[in-house]
Amino acid sequence: MTNTKYYPEVSSNADFAAIEREILKFWQDNNIFQKSIDDRNGESEFIFYDGPPFANGLPHYGHLLTGFIKDVYARYQTVKGKKVERRFGWDCHGLPAEMQSEKELGISGRLAITNFGIEKFNSHCRASVMKYASDWEEYVTRQARWVDFKNSYKTMDKNFMESVIWAFKELYNKGLLYESMRVMPYSWACETPLSNFETRLDNSYRERADKAVTVSFVLNEIPAINGMTSRESGTTSSGDYKEYRILAWTTTPWTLPSNLALAVGSDIDYASIPKEDICYIIAASSVSKYAKELGLSGEENFEIIKGSALQGLSYKPLFDYFANHPNSFKIFAGDFVVEGDGTGIVHMAPGFGEDDQILCESKGISLVCPVDNSGKFTKEIPDLEGVQVFDANDKIIIKLKEQGNWLKTEQYIHNYPHCWRTDTPLIYKAVPSWYVKVTQFKDRMVELNQQINWIPFHVKDNLFGKWLENARDWSISRNRFWGTPLPVWKSDDPKYPRIDVYGSIEELEKDFGVKVTDLHRPFIDELARPNPNDPTGKSTMRRIEDVFDCWFESGSMPYGQAHYPFENKKWFEDHFPADFIVEYSAQTRGWFYTLMVLSTALFDRPPFLNCICHGVILDATGQKLSKRLNNYADPLELFDKYGSDALRVTMLSSNVVKGQELLIDKDGKMVFDTLRLFIKPIWNAYHFFTMYANADSLKGELNFASQNVLDIYILSKLKIAVNKIEESLDNFDTQTAYHAVSEFFEVLNNWYIRRSRARFWKSEKDADKQNAYNTLYSCLETMAIAMSALVPMISEAIYLGLCHKRPDVIARKDLSLDEAISGNSHEIATALSVPRNDGSISVHLCNYPNLSSFEINHELVATMDNVLDICSNSLFIRSTENIRVRQPLATITIISKHNDKLKSFEDLIKDEINVKSVIYRDDLENYASKKLSINFPMLGKRLPAKMKEIIAASKKGEWEAIGGGLAICDETLNSDEYKLVLEPHVHIKGAASFENNSSLLILDLELTAELIEEGYARDIVRFIQQARKDADFSITDRILIEIISEFDLSKIIDNYGDFIKEQTLGEFSKNFTPDYVSKVELENHQIQLKVKRS
């Protein structure tokens, strides 16, 4: 009679990468992703915003990490019954695209691009920006992330761009935009300013060595000392000085040709230091740093001048480039001047310093900026014209020495901002730009931020919250080419000023009388019209050349993707704000921030309600992953080797989801460990079920009605795990969710299945056996659904393998996993399309398990967990003492207050840890004592002054446990400030505590001859079972056994022969031709085993 097999033949040594490829094909062939959206009616939606990446480079591990997190919560919310649209998006504009195009075209700089032709350059950008789009789709699909590529949005699409210019005009109409010439971080390599938050991206600050120079400025007036000039004060040196010089220190010598003022601190004490016939003025606190240069011994006393007394003095210009600049070359007080580095005097070049500009403009000094867009000096500095500013430092220092203004040059190592695209050092430079008045509504952003749930929580009030509190106005214009143009037209004649701002294509077409098919440069630049405010009709309205900062476009994603407000108005209003977004932590200065600015300014709402800030992935040595360093493997290689589920678990079960770093090795050992320790146990449980169910021709059913104590226990643990996964994912905590899965399968495999083997092995197909199959089936199917977001492909494979409820599949007697999920034949495809009872053909179309009708037996769980604790501790003692598990021991003594409950599991304990008897006691004090362990970091924060006293008392045992706390030194310690550890008395061997240090077990480690003999018998059983497996016998095959040994086993066979035969389905025999022969070793003696199917 042929066995009916209801389940696929599942290999215990599965090729998970191959399984995943089959699952991906099943999803594609059956359009499962789209079904997961269509099956939800939309009454309840989970709104998710997908931050747009650039497609001009391949995805890296950081992208995959973000993608895994996005996919987990999208899948989870789907099985929770919500509709989750997942529209992909592409960031297309900005420096990344332009820099790549310049490289590919072999040109560099604004002038070269203009000569090449803006239209041709932007056409190249348009083509190259999607260069890796197909690769992105391959990576994203292979990582089992479901997204809608077909309807993806692009920031370069006309509709998206129109929404961006709408937002600009809205801000303009609200009075939240202004144009200004301000000092900003400036990338001379990209020839464009950067916003202040761009300098905080991706560790843009790094260590750099610069030449710092100390320069002397010659005063035109004699400073007052104690309200008098030195001559009036009667000091001995009065009148002896040829010059008074004030010393300033700077790390940017190249800005000195643009010096227009000096700043001092009003309340700072300055010393007047004579050297020959010159008196130098410097902050008193800095004198010692210049002892050598000023010829000081360290014993001198100096006249002190308050900074306020220096205010208003004038000085001679260092150079004559701007010598006639109005209101310049004076000393002013600045609240930003502090003592420390330098001289306590700050040189002011308002074209290259933000504080400089603010102070100088307040004193009527207009800025000068003799540096061009490429960071080179202009003709205003004729002897340095065309020299790059950093290359000019040495030339300027030489000139200072020649003039007699130089005092000192030193190497200064400091953290300095670099361009996030070119890695070149930035300069600070005055440039014209359009700004969003963020400072006008930053307090409102701080308020709205309180409505957002941040993960980790501290981001809310620290990393992001502090950034919002200190927000500055945002420069949103860039003098570049490939981007959404600022919709601003100005009169080209200042006599007839006029500014027009446009917020739609319709407005443009109405005013300019042309059909607008492309908003990009140069087409938009060609739109011009007569200035309505010019009665002469000679001036023209022309567009300013700037384009938007691409971060403005990214921040416009919520409405830009919907072409709001021109289309989809209702859709946008129903899908704003987002329920969830995720990116890495630096986006608190990037995308998260720009979303917040625009959402607050335009809608007075937070842009998202839940946000995960994950950490970064580094190599095994803590270095950034880099192609140049060749320190990481192509993710596709890992997928092909271990599968993407394993990488997903590796990443999302680590601290990287809590904003910390994850170090990943190039060879993928960490991913292999995840496969071995997390994925394989899940698969092993599934393999066990299918193997034995097929052998018995039995089907499992979803059934929670068994009264078997092990079944009730594991089903209770199942519900606990399902609830914990749900609770964790509701709280955006994948770490805890993965731990719940791992913990459950640890108990399922190493406790439930192992303790239930006899029920699966026995030949009788009774109710107890069916209950065992139903229970294991229920665990597997329920967990497949519960963990489907966490391990989407392995869950799907298991779910499809358990498809025996479908009539078409039941008819197949030899259905394999590959056949079940490949859809290679009409019959199989039909089978996979037959709905389950809940209408689901895929695990990802199911509803999250609802186990409300099953009550957890908490008392049983607590007791069984104690039993498990007893057994695991006993096995650990065996391992420590080098006593193998198959070697029986005489007794275990259990000392506990819950012996009555434990006694009902005595046979289980004896069998599991292989002891002959259990002794119960309750006199714990005779065997162990409690030792107090202090949590020093925790308690030290609360009671730092009493720590020594508490430590001494704890060592003396001068404490008392009271209620939920502990009394010591007139203080009551909280539960998280201490732990009571149960320590066995020194003379007791083989002991361990359990039940939270409230109980003790003691194993009798003495081995008698009878015990040793029985241990050998169990070893022989193991040898035979391994031979059966190696011979590829079925688990139901009966066999013949012959044992040939130099070791006398006759007594063992006589005493334990029946036990050996029962355990191995065998009979002892001789003179047969074996199917398999193995050689093993027992106590250093060789044994030959022969086995044959009988």
Curated annotation (Swiss-Prot):
Cofactor: Zn(2+)
Pfam families named in the record: Anticodon_1, DUF5915, tRNA-synt_1
Keywords: Aminoacyl-tRNA synthetase, ATP-binding, Cytoplasm, Ligase, Metal-binding, Nucleotide-binding, Protein biosynthesis, Zinc
Subunit comment: Monomer.
GO cellular component: cytoplasm
Subcellular location: Cytoplasm
Species this chain originates from: Rickettsia felis (strain ATCC VR-1525 / URRWXCal2) (Rickettsia azadi)
GO terms classed as biological process: isoleucyl-tRNA aminoacylation
NCBIfam families assigned: ileS
PANTHER family the record matches: ISOLEUCINE--TRNA LIGASE, CYTOPLASMIC, SOLEUCYL-TRNA SYNTHETASE
Entry EC number(s): 6.1.1.5
Catalytic reaction list: tRNA(Ile) + L-isoleucine + ATP = L-isoleucyl-tRNA(Ile) + AMP + diphosphate
Motif 'KMSKS' region: where in chain: 624-628
Family statement drawn from the similarity comment of this UniProt entry: Belongs to the class-I aminoacyl-tRNA synthetase family. IleS type 2 subfamily.
Protein name per the record: Isoleucine--tRNA ligase
Function: Catalyzes the attachment of isoleucine to tRNA(Ile). As IleRS can inadvertently accommodate and process structurally similar amino acids such as valine, to avoid such errors it has two additional distinct tRNA(Ile)-dependent editing activities. One activity is designated as 'pretransfer' editing and involves the hydrolysis of activated Val-AMP. The other activity is designated 'posttransfer' editing and involves deacylation of mischarged Val-tRNA(Ile).
Positions occupied by motif 'HIGH' region: 53-63
MF annotations from Gene Ontology: aminoacyl-tRNA deacylase activity; ATP binding; isoleucine-tRNA ligase activity; tRNA binding; zinc ion binding
